[in-house]
Amino acid sequence: MTDKAKDVRNVLFIMADQLRFDYLSCAGHPHLHTPNIDALAARGVRFDEAYVQSPVCGSSRMSFYTGRYCRSTGAVWNNIPLRVDELTLGDYLKELDMRTVLVGKTHMAPNTEAMERLGIEASSGIGVHVSQCGFEPYERDDGLHPTERPAYKNLAYNKYLEKQGYEGDNLWHEWANSAMGEDDEILSGWLLAHADKPARIADEDSETPYMTRRAMEFIAEADAKGERWCCHLSYIKPHWPYIVPAPYHNMYGKDELLPVVRHEVERQSPHPVYGAFMEQRASTAFAKDHVREHVLPAYMGLIKQLDDQIGELMKFLEEQGRLDDTMIVFTSDHGDYMGDHWMGEKDMFHQPSVKVPMIVFDPRASADATRGTVENRMIEAIDLVPTFIEACGGTVRTHVVEGRSLEPLLAGEKDVDWREAVFSEYDYGHQWMRQKLGRHSGETGMTMIFDGRYKFVHCEGYRPILHDLQEDPQEFFDRGDDPEYASVIQRMEGLLLEWALTRNNRVTKSDAAIDAYEDKKQQLGAGVAIGFWDEKELEEARREAGFIIE
């Protein structure tokens, strides 16, 4: 391991998409064995209480990349752009002479309106920087390329498949995400009925191995140039379409799934927002046992394939000599209900959706005491940005970054004044359920606060949702209108208000600059004399401030 006094040289920031916290063997899954991810956990720390700032791809990732809550970035759902002046991980690491690149997905939407107003060309260096969330797009691929979106024609992955001899119009769909029928017809992976079939593509040419190789190519290139780097390897899977190539498509069966977590009481007079979400198509599909039993084995196969590729990646890093100086993080942008709580997809705030896997390997000797341990203190996605900055030798701009560095926890410090709660946000304004509920956009926000026992969700225009995870760890019973919990609700509302009023919105002037400001001296030095009665009083003040030296 590296010397304690040294900084981390590189960062490998691995993110899966839609990976549940409990579908890893190191997290207790009895049938889905993930030895390579487990091995990474054995080298580092597995954070067992890690929460995302939003249980949906785009807004979660914007918080991961900025170190800021959704209400600070304004990105409260998919395809809501960041402000062009929003600082990201790439900005902070650039100051440390690190090359920060993307391989895979960000779900970042460029702020084209602001760029046009400011005269920023999209193809310029600054244009690419602000359009790609501060990353250098070594290969940007958000992983969803239906034929109805013509951008697939210029997709680098499709061009790769062409070179491998695959034929068709949209190779991403026709080969990587479709199966073959008995009459040689293409069976689309968009359709859940085909999840049990193998994708047409060879395993080595499918998306997860392809992205792994692309990350290796970048690392080898950067190492050859002697560059410090941060590589964000952002996998597309196990996000839908739920289809995986052989041999992973039939490795698991319905008897190897985790038991579904749901209760009939959840469908009896549910909270209006949760009730509406239960009626969305993905929820009604996965509420059916046969759908869940048919699709989840493919989801598990995608995870197994991912674990195998993590193994290939770790072997490569060892061969490159990078395991001694590279911080490695493995996480996910959110989870997946898969029928739990009568829901599909993610979006809401139960544990399968908002809680994620989080493993951090710190190569320095300062982290030796915590290797192979499980940390139960609550952390948030926004904690990674300050962790990376500090580990790489930088100073966190605390007036901008809202996360907390994990370095004290990685070093095994016990007396750390840590957070009392975690927060997550969601806006269903873009969803069908908004119309069903008769809500206008702008009044569809939801904010969760969880203190380790009570999970409180504020829902605009409705009563709150409250779960007591000590008495009800599976979150079946909503106590949001229970008089016995009135004092708890009042306390949680107070904590939420306090949090909402203390966001970092003054980002253009640092705390240090304000602390250094001496009001009287600054005003007198600028010739401003407010409130003085006569020349004598002014002269005394100027002498005290050091402007008159005798």
Enumerate the language-model features and the residues they cover:
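Formylglycine-dependent sulfatase
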Residues: 1-459, 464, 473-494, 526-550
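Residues forming the ATP-binding cleft of Hanks-type serine/threonine protein kinase domains
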Residues: 470
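A contiguous, mid-protein "functional segment" used to position or interact
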Residues: 483-522
